[in-house]
Amino acid sequence: MQSTSILRRLTVADAMHEGIVTCSPSDDLDAVTAAMAEHSIHCVVAIDEGPPGADDDRLWGVVSDVELMRGLDSPLDLDAGNIAELDTAAVAPEATLEHAARTMASRRVAHLVVVDRGRPVGVLSTLDVVRAVAAVRALR
């Protein structure tokens, strides 16, 4: 089966990581560094928690390992909000992996935040897409 055929059949929900690791825009870079190291991940999703008591976490941005390295190298005292990519590439869980792969390629990003009704619910990486294709091919 061709890879493009596999990508058309599978959805983002089939391959994404659920249970995202998040931070607040006000978190210091030490906290973001610790979260990435603890979970062995390449990005942390920055969320706007909304008013106290509200269950309304909204995507604010993404701090990737690349932005983190730049921030750690800065002489300034920065927080996650200072280095997060605000024009975050996002995708819906029901989108095809083909759509997600094209979005990653056109945006030149290695991760997409999976958003359902405005709320971040997962992360899809290029490696997740590769693993999904490999798993389907292994079943042949």
Predicted regions and their residues:
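Tandem CBS (Cystathionine beta-synthase) repeat/Bateman regulatory domains
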Residues: 1-140
